[in-house]
C-alpha cells in the first residue's frame, strides 16, 4: 500500500487528521529516525487533536455567540474598575457549571456584562461543556415559534439540558 492508498483508507476510517499528517509525519519519522511505535503515537495524537479542534469549533458554533471575539483576553478590566477580576477568573474555571450553580451579571448598559457572559461561555466550552447563548428577545421568539409549531417540549428540553445557558 502506498501513501495515497493509505491516506484514502484513513479517510474511509474517518481519520482525516492522520491522513492529513501522514506525509509530513513520514518525513519527520525518517529524519528523526522515529521508532514505529513513536511514529504511530504521533499520528494518533494528530487525529485526537484534530477531533478535539473540530469538537471545540462545533460547540462554539452551536452556542450561538453574538460575537466570537469576546474572550477574557480581550476584556478590558481597567475600563470597569468595579469588576471583581478574581471572581471573573474563578467563574472561568467552570466550577459553577459542574456544581449546577447559577450566575447573574447586573449593571447599567456598557459595563461589559455581555462581553463577560460570552467570554465565560467560551471558557466553559474549552473545558468540554456545551453552552447555549441567546439574547433574551431571541430566546423568547424561539420559544414562541416552538409553541406555534408544536415543538415547545422539544425546545425546552434543548434549552434546559445544556450545562450552561446564557441569557443576555
Question: What is the meaning of each model-derived region?
Answer:
Residues 7, 15-68:
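Interdomain "pre-motor" coupling segment immediately N-terminal to P-loop NTPase/helicase cores
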Residues 9, 61-84:
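Dynamic helix-loop-helix/coil hinge segments at AAA+ ATPase domain boundaries and subdomain interfaces
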Residues 81-89, 131-160:
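Short glycine-rich substrate-engagement loop in P-loop NTPases that contacts/grips substrate
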Residues 92-100:
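Phosphate-binding P-loop
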Residues 100-116:
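Walker A/P-loop nucleotide-binding motif
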Residues 121-133:
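Post-Walker A helix-loop "phosphate-sensing" segment adjacent to the P-loop in P-loop NTPases
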Residues 158-168:
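Conserved P-loop NTPase "ATPase switch" module shared by AAA+ and STAND
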Amino acid at each position: 500500500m502506498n501513501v495515497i492508498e493509505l491516506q484514502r483508507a484513513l479517510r474511509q476510517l474517518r481519520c482525516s487528521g492522520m491522513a492529513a499528517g501522514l506525509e509530513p509525519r513520514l518525513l519527520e519519522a525518517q529524519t528523526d529516525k522515529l521508532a514505529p511505535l513513536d511514529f504511530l503515537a504521533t499520528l494518533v495524537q494528530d487525529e485526537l487533536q484534530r477531533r478535539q479542534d473540530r469538537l471545540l469549533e462545533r460547540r462554539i458554533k452551536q452556542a450561538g455567540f453574538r460575537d466570537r471575539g469576546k474572550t477574557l483576553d480581550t476584556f478590558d478590566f481597567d475600563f470597569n474598575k468595579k469588576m471583581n477580576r478574581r471572581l471573573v477568573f474563578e467563574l472561568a474555571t467552570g466550577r459553577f457549571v459542574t456544581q449546577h450553580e447559577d450566575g447573574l451579571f447586573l449593571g447599567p448598559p456598557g459595563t461589559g456584562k455581555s462581553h463577560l457572559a460570552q467570554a465565560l461561555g467560551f471558557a466553559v466550552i474549552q473545558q468540554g461543556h456545551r453552552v447555549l447563548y441567546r439574547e433574551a428577545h431571541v430566546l423568547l421568539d424561539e420559544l414562541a415559534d416552538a409553541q406555534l409549531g408544536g415543538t415547545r417540549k422539544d425546545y425546552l428540553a434543548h434549552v434546559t439540558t445544556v450545562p450552561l445557558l446564557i441569557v443576555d
